[in-house]
């Protein structure tokens, strides 16, 4: 016989499943910030990104308009996004 879960159980399961579906934190090119500022901000605020990766990602955003910085759970992406916005970088989150 199938087990029927209650509403609270469904919410808990949905929450756990959403953390398994990573989102993409995307950096957008801008004409305001210096390249050095972008690299330093990425390294200082996203632990997964090394200096070399930050430089590469900054150049991709500069040349192509956008670049995916990281793929991670939504909550972490929102935290990183707030940190980057505080430092005047333009970011979006894509599901």
Regions found by a protein language model. Name each.
Residues 1-95:
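Terminal domain-initiation and capping elements
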